[in-house]
Amino acid sequence: MAETLSGLGDSGAAGAAALSSASSETGTRRLSDLRVIDLRAELRKRNVDSSGNKSVLMERLKKAIEDEGGNPDEIEITSEGNKKTSKRSSKGRKPEEEGVEDNGLEENSGDGQEDVETSLENLQDIDIMDISVLDEAEIDNGSVADCVEDDDADNLQESLSDSRELVEGEMKELPEQLQEHAIEDKETINNLDTSSSDFTILQEIEEPSLEPENEKILDILGETCKSEPVKEESSELEQPFAQDTSSVGPDRKLAEEEDLFDSAHPEEGDLDLASESTAHAQSSKADSLLAVVKREPAEQPGDGERTDCEPVGLEPAVEQSSAASELAEASSEELAEAPTEAPSPEARDSKEDGRKFDFDACNEVPPAPKESSTSEGADQKMSSPEDDSDTKRLSKEEKGRSSCGRNFWVSGLSSTTRATDLKNLFSKYGKVVGAKVVTNARSPGARCYGFVTMSTAEEATKCINHLHKTELHGKMISVEKAKNEPVGKKTSDKRDSDGKKEKSSNSDRSANLKRDDKCDRKDDAKKGDDGSGEKSKDQDDQKPGPSERSRATKSGSRGTERTVVMDKSKGVPVISVKTSGSKERASKSLDRKSASREKRSVVSFDKVKEPRKSRDSESHRVRERSEREQRMQAQWEREERERLEIARERLAFQRQRLERERMERERLERERMHVEHERRREQERIHREREELRRQQELRYEQERRPAVRRPYDLDRRDDAYWPEAKRAALDERYHSDFNRQDRFHDFDHRDRGRYPDHSVDRREGSRSMMGEREGQHYPERHGGPERHGRDSRDGWGGYGSDKRMSEGRGLPPPPRRDWGDHGRREDDRAWQGTADGGMMDRDHKRWQGGERSMSGHSGPGHMMNRGGMSGRGSFAPGGASRGHPIPHGGMQGGFGGQSRGSRPSDARFTRRY
């Protein structure tokens, strides 16, 4: 089996010539014809690194041969050594592969990478890799499992001894007719012990009894091949860096895979199909035999496996072959139950082609070690065809029964669960032969399932009873027995996803292919003697399929046909030997499988696409909805911005309008204030002018009334105390008389002016007196009382003093005090009756003060205009009239100036001049 696996990954054209004569003869082969196993063996002989893919190995070997001085194109290879090295290399790589599979995707070994690359090349045309083994725990029950290096000869010997013991025990149970073959197989096992490190025993076994044994082993290999590829392919799918199937540890894997196949596990079936096609396409049957031999030691250490591992030795191979035939039968039944699920035709064709080519090589190409052993096996099989078929059936039934109940599925695993976890968990209730964690390679993210094989059905039942519905790594796991009946149905129960169908179909396909392989091998062995391969093949095409297996097993050598076919995956010629029954059955099953396979693949593809489409449509709807919402949001924001802008503009316009109105109001208020101010100022001016005019009129009137007395007379009267009674009567009469009388000055005699001396009046003092009076008039509230009092007293006393002096000097009678004071008070009252604004009066006062300096005589009690007001003795100065005050001219033009001068002494400030 290991050889089969190695052939799957590694054998090229050299696969056809893999079987050489059993003798350890040396033959020259081209470097390009060497398989990876051979390349590695040659490299190990030369102590050169044997890791890497085929191209790297070829380059390394070529360089090593050139260094030795040899011809790299013609390499001498000892057939025995070749076979041994191939086996050993496969065995040596098995631990590596085990390590890779144990760790799942966690580890990548260099050898695994090369082997995976080669195996992937072989599998590139096969699309039936539905099941991928995520993780596989190789059971360390046997020493073979413990072998991590190629040189663990001790472990191999132990395993071989175990296998020998097993074979002996089985021999006792086998029919006597098989005893001969068993003995021969025993000898073969002894040979295996002697050369345990190399596993080249198959080539050394040349007894005729080997033929039937080889045939049976090939049949078993068909099964194991299929089951092992399950592992292998899964590892390839899951771990691109895993080693090639050829490098897969054949011993342990084969044991596990066989068990898995016995349980007709759908997942294995899937994997089996994929790897099986490649294995058969590229490996010879001798490889298969070798693999079986290797594998049996592996399985035997696994206690419970021994029944399944009967083919361990070539003798066990006899029993195993019968078991394989039975397995093929079971697989055919399974196939019938799950007809919809069929393996890809390519896989089977390649497998059949591989068989044909191998057997042709066995019969026709003696130089290859594989071929020689195969031909020998064919001869042996011819010797006892019917016995072989019977023994096959028996062993297969026993094996099926024994392995049927030992396998169980573990579903609901956590994504972190590894095969070693399962092994540790179930080892509490018995010996765990194999444990795998598999998933559906077609649907990423599919759930993981565990497939566990116990050593006995009782232990499996115990595990199911104790561990069903228990918790592992935080997940509830369910443990269910793996049934042989409908493989596809079991997987469907296990999985709701497409992976179920694919797995079951793969298992069916693998079963059918294995059965076909068995029948083909048997028939080939029988036909090897007859040599009528082609005819039987034609007949086989015409035969129906249901009873083909039994018919094929019975008609041992009668209906085989050898056909050389080009392997599709590698383009290598492969010899396929088929019996008529096996071929037709294979063709029918292949058609059925291919149809179901296509159907399933289509369905699975549609199913895979449906959720994707729904997700895409949902995401598209969500995206459209979000875009629509974004557009609506953007539109709403835009409208909102426009509304806000309009509102802002309206507010700004209203603010501007209010500002304009406010400014207009302020302007109107200013104008009103200005007009009011002008009006008040005009009123004040009019008041002042009227007051001045009145004062002047009073002065004139008084001077008119005053008798034109000579100065001596005045001087005489000076002692009369100002004629109080007479003066008072006159003043009373005057002040109470009508002031509006326009002719009151007409009787004034201008000639009297000459009597009064002209007093030169200081302009500044006159204006100062005017200022003083005006200040008194303009601030009645603040100092009206004191000012009036001062003015009254000044006027009175000034008049008194001046009159007194005048009377003293000139005889003028002093004017009475009272009338001037009273008149000043009355005039003050009259002048400021309408005044309201003190500040404005102050300003106006100042303005009048500066601007009316030309009328210096307006505000004093007796001051007349000093500047330009009088022209000589002419009429009243135009300064007064120019301001719009009507002043009578008639009668005044004589002594007006003198009159004013005469009255000026009434001011106290001028008394010092006299």
Swiss-Prot record:
CDD domains: RRM_SAFB1_SAFB2 (cd12679)
Molecular function, one GO term: RNA binding
Compositionally biased residues, Gly residues: 891-900
Domain SAP, residue spans: 31-65
Main location, first listed in the record: nucleus
Pfam families: RRM_1, SAP
Positions with biased composition (Polar residues): 275-286, 371-383
Post-translational modification: Sumoylated by PIAS1 with SUMO1 and SUMO2/3, desumoylated by SENP1. Sumoylation is required for transcriptional repressor activity.
Biased composition (Basic and acidic residues): 225-234, 293-309, 346-359, 390-401, 477-551, 559-570, 581-636, 748-795, 816-831, 840-850, 904-914
Subunit and partners: Monomer and homodimer. Interacts with KHDRBS3. Interacts with CLK2. Interacts with POLR2A, ASF/SRSF1, SRp30c/SRFS9 and TRA2B/SFRS10. Interacts with SRPK1 and inhibits its activity. Interacts with RBMX. Interacts with FUS. Interacts with ZBED4.
Listed name of the protein: Scaffold attachment factor B1
Species per Swiss-Prot/TrEMBL record: Pongo abelii (Sumatran orangutan)
